[in-house]
């Protein structure tokens, strides 16, 4: 899926190349790893480069980027990666009727990934990462040795259902329809559980995939679920958020009434590398430059993309991705639009740098929060 990297992009107006700036720029609180020197977060630096070269904030203000259509995330072409020759070859890689245009868009998205990841200083391998970043990555990649695939799970992007599928494939569960409370650790193997040589072998030879979601919609889903339903999160995070950002909150708030703008203010002040996994940027969870994923599925096409992956890895025909429950009400584009339009514009502009690589790498348009759009 990732051909040879393109020639690095020229820095705007004679500026430093991306990788050199990564090595030189200070970060403040964020650190590369245990005892490592400070590093500038790639998302922050990438945002600064984009702003300097193309006036991104002005485009956000005018709603220009919001008019861009998201690029559908679809199967890779036939050009080989290691897994195809050394793991069971999934059948039916040819495009379905009517998918040719979608393949073109997928190719455009791949060029974006190659252009960003091909910059000097960007990681090419998990062992290029600082210790802390590599630890986070390896703890989020699940392993199926029986079906020879690796799945980087992203919270709030159907990861519980994928873990349920993996337990069925491992013979731990009889069916994906078993409605037991999901244990997110037991009977699952993570790359972090393996020795370095075992990790390298699987990264080279196994089919690798992840699923992504519109970044702010994912944040809204985490906000609604964790602060609206789960007492542990209300006590651990909600109470602290209220103390920090609400005037006259008192010393012991319950944390069960955090507003979305308060949550966004909290995210602005957090180091992305140390965030809770439910709102950590996908870039930091799955490191798509360090790991060359064969497929990136999307939440918007969840069931179709997931079942395509199961065909590719030759899962038994009776194992299908669970259908969404009738009672489930996910965060919708309409709900997201309402919450974003209710938040201060300046606050949104402060939040976007944390997630700009998730928008750009995975081809999601930036939100349109102009006055005109919010009045509709």
From Swiss-Prot:
Its main location: Golgi. It is an enzyme of class 2 (transferase). Its EC number is 2.8.2.35. It is a single-pass type II membrane protein. Disulfide bonds: none annotated. It is linked to Ehlers-Danlos syndrome, musculocontractural type 1: A form of Ehlers-Danlos syndrome characterized by distinctive craniofacial dysmorphism, congenital contractures of thumbs and fingers, clubfeet, severe kyphoscoliosis, muscular hypotonia, hyperextensible thin skin with easy bruisability and atrophic scarring, wrinkled palms, joint hypermobility, and ocular involvement. Belongs to the sulfotransferase 2 family. This is Carbohydrate sulfotransferase 14. It comes from Homo sapiens.
